[in-house]
Amino acid sequence: MGKNFSLNTNKARPKNDFYQTPYSMTRHLLDREKFEGKIFEPCCGEGAILKVLDEYNYEYSCGDITFASNFLENFSQHDNIITNPPYSLAKEFILHAKEHTSKKIAMLLPLNYLHGIQRYREVWLDTEFPLKKIYVFCRYPMLSNEIREDGKYGSGMMVYAWFIWDRDHKGSATIDWIDNSDDIIKK
């Protein structure tokens, strides 16, 4: 994102692209998608996604690069993965997850991740572990390294979506929208 479009123009990018996932964003995902089996969160940071998985009574395990558990060096098999990966490594995370996941993958990514010929060839054309659904947030969430207990967040300038891959999915991916207006902090 260019400096003219970012609200973070004078700050360095957080180490390891650390942006927490507001609780409400994960709740929106889990209200729409069901996961069978255990969930692995490879970028757990301070546990924001894990807190919501706990609320929804999912069994999970986690890892994070900050405590020596680099997902790209992890070759364990998982039933499902839910994560907000470092966007600078998104393609690598997606490809690695597809090799080590048996059921579903959900990743929170900027919507503009959809474009690009290399991603098209390496990620989107895959029919063995295809993209099933994209849940686009109607309002632009502002992700930061701090989150509020109530799950609310400011409005930013980047469009985010939950991208869902499902090994058993047949056919084209579909798009749905998440009305997150109630999650935006009113000024």
Predicted features and spans:
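Class I S-adenosyl-L-methionine-dependent methyltransferase catalytic core
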Residues: M1-K187
